[in-house]
UniProtKB/Swiss-Prot annotation:
Similarity field: Belongs to the glutamate--cysteine ligase type 2 family. YbdK subfamily.
Pfam name, any one: GCS2
Gene Ontology biological process terms, A to Z: modified amino acid biosynthetic process
Protein name from the UniProt record: Putative glutamate--cysteine ligase 2
Length: 372
């Protein structure tokens, strides 16, 4: 399979994708009716796109190319309104969160889509288990070499992005003890985690060619790396965040990634090296397991530091870039979140500790997404 040339796009432009849960009240399990909902809302869209994801209990909201987080917020808000109206008419609910807390993967129906059916053939039950819900953020790049540099730079902050967005403590009716259990679902996939090391776009093209020899990779979309280049869009796509419970938090996470990309490409604070990834999976695990209370270990010095403290340092570093991009409100909101010491996974556990049920938790998530 030949790799597309890297499409030239305007640096730092944004695209946001949100994988949403389609809920069936009053039991608040996942519905299998996303196709009905998607067909109802598509004719009403004026910007962005609403489409299928892997299974019939999922739908994806995707913006077009946006200059800044305000434009992205406007597009997502308009889609949110249309979806909620259609969901109400069809007696369905919509919510965020990285996992549904008590759905059974065996009940999930893979969409009648050629690509997803081929993926089901390749990966079997793993695809049904991948009924989990993430936020993806695309950032525009001028060329392929910049994209590879940006990918390596952003990889330093994968634990930070995970910890800030963690919203998946419950799965299959149980507390997993993880802040973000969603990413564990992909651990059995052969392309889980970081992209194999390359130093420029030419080397990446060679890597992709070799991956295509496996017959399991037909396009970039078939690769499940934490961060991947998207040559057709001219972007780098960050894929490690849980879908937030609110649109505001989704916008804040996108603003952080946009500002971090600007800081990385203008300041060039790192010289990427393969050794940067030696402890990548250990630090990623700390973020998934403990959220902001996790501990990062430096691959070169062995120094250890709290993820919360290092996240505050990242927010300080990218603040000037955020101001230039109009994303400073996002950085301010995330800084406040870190100082308060929580994420949405912690809120979910507090809800249950206060006597709530998992059914009640999903109902509450639907109310939060609807702004009630």
């Amino acid at each position: 399979m030949t790799l597309n040339d890297f499409h030239v796009s305007e640096p730092y432009t944004l695209g946001i994708e949100l994988e949403m849960q389609v809920i069936n009240p009053p039991g608040y399990d996942l519905s299998q009716d996303s196709s009905t909902l998607i067909d109802a809302v598509k004719p009403q869209l004026t910007a962005g796109e609403i489409k299928h994801d892997i299974t019939e209990s999922m739908l994806e909201m995707a913006t077009g190319v946006c200059r800044d987080i305000d434009q992205a917020a406007a597009q997502l808000s308009a889609m949110q309104h249309v979806i909620l109206q259609a969901a109400s008419e069809h007696h369905l609910g919509i919510c965020g969160g990285g996992t549904h807390p008590f759905q059974k993967w065996q009940r999930q129906e893979v969409c009648d889509n050629e690509r997803y059916q081929r993926t089901l053939e390749n990966f079997g039950y793993l695809i049904q288990q991948a009924t989990v819900f993430g936020q993806h953020v695309h950032v525009g790049c001028a060329n392929g070499d910049d994209a590879i540099y940006l990918l390596h730079g952003l990889s330093h902050f994968v634990p930070h992005f995970i910890a800030l967005s963690a919203a998946s403590p419950y799965m299959q009716g149980s507390d997993t003890r993880f802040a973000c259990a969603r990413l564990n679902i992909f651990s059995a996939f052969p392309d889980n985690g970081p992209m194999p090391w390359v130093s420029n776009w030419q080397e990446f093209a060679g890597l992709f060619r070799r991956l295509s020899y496996t017959t399991m990779i037909d396009s970039i979309k078939d690769l499940h790396w934490d961060i991947r280049p998207s040559p057709a869009f001219g972007t780098v796509e960050v894929r490690v965040m849980d879908t937030p419970l609110t649109l505001d938090h989704a916008i804040n996470m996108a603003g952080l990634i946009q500002a971090t990309a600007h800081w990385l490409l203008t300041e060039r604070p790192f010289k990427p090296q393969e050794q940067d990834y030696l402890l990548y999976k250990f630090n990623r695990f700390q973020a998934c397991r403990y959220g902001l209370e996790g501990v990062l270990t430096d691959a070169y010095t062995g120094d250890r530091r709290r993820l919360a403290d290092d996240t505050l340092r990242l927010l300080d570093n990218v603040t000037p870039s955020a101001r230039k991009l109009g994303a400073d409100s996002a950085i301010d909101a995330l800084r406040l979140q870190v100082k308060k010491g929580g994420n949405e996974a912690q809120y979910m556990r507090e809800f249950i500790a206060d006597g709530g049920s998992l059914i009640g938790l999903v109902q509450k998530h639907c109310e939060i997404w609807a702004g009630q």
